[in-house]
């Protein structure tokens, strides 16, 4: 029996009709209907017969089936119960796919990887991420104690640009710092709205993030470090001096201490957050230990 690619307008429409499926806007459902785009995603991910893939939001399986053809195993998390019978149908030719009907943010990913991908030499996250929760999903996966080698993911263009942004640019912010702390980021391609059904309201981008062997800087408390960096961008037009006065408890009373702390790290208090590198924030984080008055 010959199987037609799912990622075509005609096959997707036929499946929608067959299952009486209606898109849920609340779940950010936009299905890929262009095999060429999917092939570029596969190519960028460098998956092969030794790779285990984690997919989030497989939809009707348009990307999943191509992953199954190229990877050793695919584990796909789908939150929408209505899509489970569709996926069981569309992916029936492939015995290397596991569909998990669960919210990726609530799932025990380490256990799932140990159960389904334990015999894979490397693990990649390859997905057309639901746009409304792209950032929480990525941060959750980056911070898992799971040997993920990298990500090739489709997302809203604006979010992708923030992940990949360089210091001093408009898009650079706390998300750039977290992503680049854990991974080396690069843009794969920009994707037009026309390759989705239904078309999203925003432009899309595919971004590649490869896990670093070691984080970009060494800190003893990642959560505290990220909070400190995020505070510098609380009000982008304000100086870091002003932002940190608002961030720290009794910051207004400790203006002079904040100024001394910034200067001890070699940072001009009049600078804005977007001009500070990740290394600058790491220095600030270390220097803060010398100023016991600065608490939050």
Swiss-Prot record:
Domain of life: Bacteria
CDD domains in UniProt: AdoMet_MTases
Pfam families: RrnaAD
Reaction(s) catalysed by this chain's protein: adenosine(1518)/adenosine(1519) in 16S rRNA + 4 S-adenosyl-L-methionine = N(6)-dimethyladenosine(1518)/N(6)-dimethyladenosine(1519) in 16S rRNA + 4 S-adenosyl-L-homocysteine + 4 H(+)
Top-level enzyme category: transferase
Residues involved in S-adenosyl-L-methionine binding: 30, 32, 57, 78, 103, 128
PROSITE patterns noted in UniProt: RRNA_A_DIMETH, SAM_RNA_A_N6_MT
UniProt xrefs under SMART domains: rADc
Keyword 4Fe-4S: no
Protein name per its UniProtKB record: Ribosomal RNA small subunit methyltransferase A
Organism of provenance: Staphylococcus epidermidis (strain ATCC 35984 / DSM 28319 / BCRC 17069 / CCUG 31568 / BM 3577 / RP62A)
